[in-house]
């Protein structure tokens, strides 16, 4: 009950200070599992997106929150846990590198090399037929191979439970007009959860509400623009996908 009252109070404060306008282009608000990915300007980004979503989406969407910042005081931790149902991410954790075994086959086991035809080779005959290229790992294998120490592990658990999440692929707050290059987390999640809809979002003006280092918010009109979903194409490499996703976010700035 207390969390519900605090939710209504915070929603009123955020909308009073920012207007919290949500604009949907090519992607109507829909109760389906999604990964919303947006530019990152302020700690208030999480709060603004939460307030911009309609109630039926807020209840199934969990924003990520920097653990070191949002658990610094008991009040912050209670709000992010009880009100936002946030997913805490340890910014100091080191992402796990994929092993050769996982990259080789869906089951996580390395592909066995075909035995060489020694007699044919020694006789000067044709070499054995080359092996077929290893199949890409399945989403299930990728999730199973992710260690609990990986910073993506809490996000994977949230998605496995059916929740939608809000992430900021830059990994840290930007200071320019455009977001910084996206880190690999969005690509990995797209590989692990191909059925989840990836929705870009552009957050406008929130850095002026709560500039870095300030504790008192400044009233100013803000908006969140949601765009058409993007999808990881078959065989698409990490950097081309991340650059394309970043461009989808930037394009919403002009809508």
Predicted regions and their residues:
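Membrane-anchoring hydrophobic helices of lipid-metabolizing enzymes
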Residues: 1-48, 53, 58-61, 71-78, ...
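Residue-level preference for the first positions of well-ordered beta-strands
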Residues: 33-35, 162-168
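Short glycine-rich anion-binding loops that position phosphate/pyrophosphate groups of nucleotides
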Residues: 40-42, 170-173
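Hydrophobic/aromatic beta-strand patches that form the interior of the parallel beta-sheet core
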Residues: 64, 87, 199-201
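Short, charged beta->alpha transition segments
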Residues: 74-75, 149-160
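A cross-family acyltransferase "interaction/gating" segment
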Residues: 75-78, 164, 172-236
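A charged, well-structured terminal subsegment
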Residues: 99-108, 157, 225-241, 245
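A conditional alpha-helix N-cap/helix-loop micro-motif detector
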Residues: 144-149, 179-180, 238, 242
């Amino acid at each position: 009950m207390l969390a519900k009252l605090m939710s209504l109070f915070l929603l009123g404060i955020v909308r009073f200070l920012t207007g919290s306008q949500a604009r949907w282009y090519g992607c109507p608000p829909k109760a389906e599992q999604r990964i919303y990915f947006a530019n990152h300007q302020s700690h208030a980004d999480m709060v603004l997106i939460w307030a911009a979503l309609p109630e039926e989406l807020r209840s199934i969407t969990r924003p990520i929150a920097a653990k070191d910042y949002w658990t610094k005081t008991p009040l912050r931790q209670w709000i992010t846990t009880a009100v936002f149902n946030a997913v805490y991410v340890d910014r100091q954790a080191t992402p796990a590198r994929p092993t050769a075994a996982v990259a080789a086959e869906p089951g996580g086991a390395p592909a066995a090399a075909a035995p060489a035809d020694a007699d044919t080779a020694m006789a000067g005959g044709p070499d054995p037929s080359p092996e077929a290229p290893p199949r890409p790992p399945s989403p299930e294998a990728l999730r199973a191979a992710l260690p609990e120490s990986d910073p993506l592990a809490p996000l994977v658990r949230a998605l496995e439970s059916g929740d939608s999440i809000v992430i900021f692929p830059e990994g840290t707050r930007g200071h320019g007009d455009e977001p910084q290059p996206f880190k690999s987390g969005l690509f990995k999640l797209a590989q692990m959860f191909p059925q989840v809809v990836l929705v870009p979002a552009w957050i406008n003006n929130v850095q002026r509400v709560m500039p870095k280092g300030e504790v008192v918010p400044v009233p100013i009109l803000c908006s969140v623009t949601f765009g058409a979903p993007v999808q990881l194409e078959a065989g698409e490499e990490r950097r081309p996908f991340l650059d394309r996703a970043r461009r989808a976010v930037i394009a919403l700035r002009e809508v």
